[in-house]
Swiss-Prot record:
Keywords: Chaperone, Mitochondrion, Transit peptide. Plays an essential role in the assembly of succinate dehydrogenase (SDH), an enzyme complex (also referred to as respiratory complex II) that is a component of both the tricarboxylic acid (TCA) cycle and the mitochondrial electron transport chain, and which couples the oxidation of succinate to fumarate with the reduction of ubiquinone (coenzyme Q) to ubiquinol. Promotes maturation of the iron-sulfur protein subunit SDHB of the SDH catalytic dimer, protecting it from the deleterious effects of oxidants. May act together with SDHAF1. It is found in: Mitochondrion matrix. Residues 1-30 form a transit peptide. It comes from Homo sapiens. This is Succinate dehydrogenase assembly factor 3, mitochondrial. Disulfide bonds: none annotated. Interacts with SDHB within an SDHA-SDHB subcomplex. Its main location: mitochondrion. GO terms for biological process: mitochondrial respiratory chain complex II assembly; regulation of gluconeogenesis; succinate metabolic process. The gene is SDHAF3. It comes from the Eukaryota.
Amino acid sequence: MPGRHVSRVRALYKRVLQLHRVLPPDLKSLGDQYVKDEFRRHKTVGSDEAQRFLQEWEVYATALLQQANENRQNSTGKACFGTFLPEEKLNDFRDEQIGQLQELMQEATKPNRQFSISESMKPKF
């Protein structure tokens, strides 16, 4: 059983990093670092929390794949990633998670981004 769990975690980790390749460079960098930190942070959690963690990352990977496919079919050439987070979902977050979410939002919306991204750049998948 533990071997299967490790394989599942590794496969999901690689899948998420691979999906990040369709993101603009600054968001890819931010997302990759966040994924690495989160997977490292959850390495020693209990079985129940590990299952919830994997389920949420699988939902994220599925949503990102869907958005990447929609962006690829979009004729305007402008990629759009992300989703609305309803208040009910926010109420389920712990204080630590709210803090992480705020940090991510601040990083993702910084006006002085590290890279210059062309609007016409369409990610390849």
